[in-house]
Amino acid sequence: MGRFISVSFGLLVVFLSLSGTGADFDCPSGWSAYDWYCYKPFNEPQTWDDAERFCTEQAKGGHLVSIESSGEADFVGQLVSENIQRPEIYVWIGLRDRRKEQQCSSEWSDGTSIIYVNWNKGESQMCQGLSKWTNFLKWDNTDCQAKNPFVCKFPPQC
């Protein structure tokens, strides 16, 4: 009976260690996992276009980070606060205004729908960055040609 309990407890420990993180996959070394995606902040300032190009070269499906929930916003804000050690005020995210037939609309660079927004008061145009003044939680617009650190995101391959 004691052996049965010991084996059962061992299996429970293994199960709990493999579940509960929301990340039953491996991200490459130096990348952080959250809700089925891998994330990494980069300190080297780039323009928005150059940062997006860099992210697409990191992994299949890679782009500047799209933020789809308040939980993800908190995770990315914490990741940036802990890893971006530069004086820049903004950190690029994958949101950008696009002009289509006389109309402007914002879209994520990875093509996902905008279902969560967290613009700083009065902001919603040009390229978007996480603002240092809001602990990297709110989005501000800034010139797309400005050079800022950035965060890449990609879905890991099975």
From Swiss-Prot:
Segment forming the signal sequence: 1-23
GO molecular function: toxin activity
Domain of life of the organism encoding this protein: Eukaryota
Tissue localization of expression: Expressed by the venom gland.
Keyword Signal among UniProt keywords: yes
Disulphide bridges, residue numbers: C27-C38, C55-C152, C127-C144
Entry keyword annotation includes Protease: no
GO cellular component: extracellular region
Listed Gene3D superfamilies: Mannose-Binding Protein A, subunit A
Self-association and partners: Heteromultimer; disulfide-linked.
Similarity-based family: Belongs to the snaclec family.
Protein role: Interferes with one step of hemostasis (modulation of platelet aggregation, or coagulation cascade, for example).
PANTHER family: MANNOSE, PHOSPHOLIPASE, LECTIN RECEPTOR RELATED (PTHR22803)
Protein name per the record: Snaclec stejaggregin-A subunit alpha
Source species of the chain: Trimeresurus stejnegeri (Chinese green tree viper)
